[in-house]
From Swiss-Prot:
UniProt protein name: Phosphoserine aminotransferase
Entry binding sites for pyridoxal 5'-phosphate: A77, S78, W103, T153, D173, Q196, N238, T239
Main location: cytoplasm
Residues the record lists as N6-(pyridoxal phosphate)lysine modifications: K197
A GO BP entry: L-serine biosynthetic process
Protein function: Catalyzes the reversible conversion of 3-phosphohydroxypyruvate to phosphoserine and of 3-hydroxy-2-oxo-4-phosphonooxybutanoate to phosphohydroxythreonine.
CDD domains: PSAT_like
Pfam family, one: Aminotran_5
Keyword tags: Amino-acid biosynthesis, Aminotransferase, Cytoplasm, Pyridoxal phosphate, Pyridoxine biosynthesis, Serine biosynthesis, Transferase
Assembly mode: Homodimer.
GO molecular-function terms, A-Z: O-phospho-L-serine:2-oxoglutarate aminotransferase activity; pyridoxal phosphate binding
Cellular component annotations (GO), alphabetically ordered: cytoplasm
Amino acid sequence: MSKRAFNFCAGPAALPDAVLQRAQAEMLDWRGKGLSVMEMSHRSDDYVAIAEKAEQDLRDLLSVPSNYKVLFLQGGASQQFAEIPLNLLPENGVADYVETGIWSKKAIEEARRFGSVNVAASAKAYDYLAIPGQNEWKLSKNAAYLHYASNETIGGLQFDWVPEAGDVPLVVDMSSDILSRPIDVSQYGLIYAGAQKNIGPSGLVVVIVREDLLGRARSSCPTMLDYKVSADNGSMYNTPATYSWYLSGLVFEWLKEQGGVEAMEQRNRAKKDRLYGFIDSSEFYTNPISHNARSWMNVPFRLADERLDKAFLAGADARGLLNLKGHRSVGGMRASIYNALGLEAVEALVGYMAEFEKEHA
């Protein structure tokens, strides 16, 4: 096997080598059945067993309470921007949203197509370098739900606390930091996460929803987007993204073998401490995000001279350090260090950054 590169892509992101090797071994002949998982009927006993095990492993990893449904859906997190208000926002109601970057802004824009949205707080007041404290938020009296994104992949802002919503259902986009550290699922009404960062390949979104929030969809809500329909049909109202679901199940198995989300928290803390520590000690690289809002998963940084960006990226690619270019909306660099990347990937990046700084500072 040729040497694997270190993939710092924000998504679709790196997958564990062990997962890819397992999928490769099972590609043509899954457990002696003589066919690939991609060829299985989603109604077959074998595939149903794959799907059920994936769900149970995810429940185990996150300690999901029994009064929550776990759904494996299609359309990615972006479809949830519409699906959430269609299911949870009454036509004459209002939903509270917190805007901390591009993804939460997209969620707000989509929700406005279906009803009234109150932007309770915005990081724009801090130039998207910090998250407003909840004492600054202007929440509605009777909001249908409170929505926020726990981690903004593009700007590199992450909540290190859970908002207090009282009796209002708390809805969170955890696409980029789910499974990176322990969470208390019972604090949320609904959690959703696109798969292609910390769960598996693209084509899948996981939704964890409290049962009392089911059955609230508008009459105009398409059947395919009704959470209750999805829950009642075991996420198989139509043919699901079978192979993405299977691969995600392999990732869940790998996570359990690694020690679960508690072990991932330690691993991710070491990675982010190493990378931010190097950036902060350098006079050549900068990250302006407030320290208590810095993302553990997505680390944006800039070089002292942006004219060196192309040379930096070319040198990184030559060393097998891939996809470090920042998002087109913000520029600079971005290292996405999800669960699948180990500390050795960060050490390789820091080593190259130090070398490049020595040559160009």
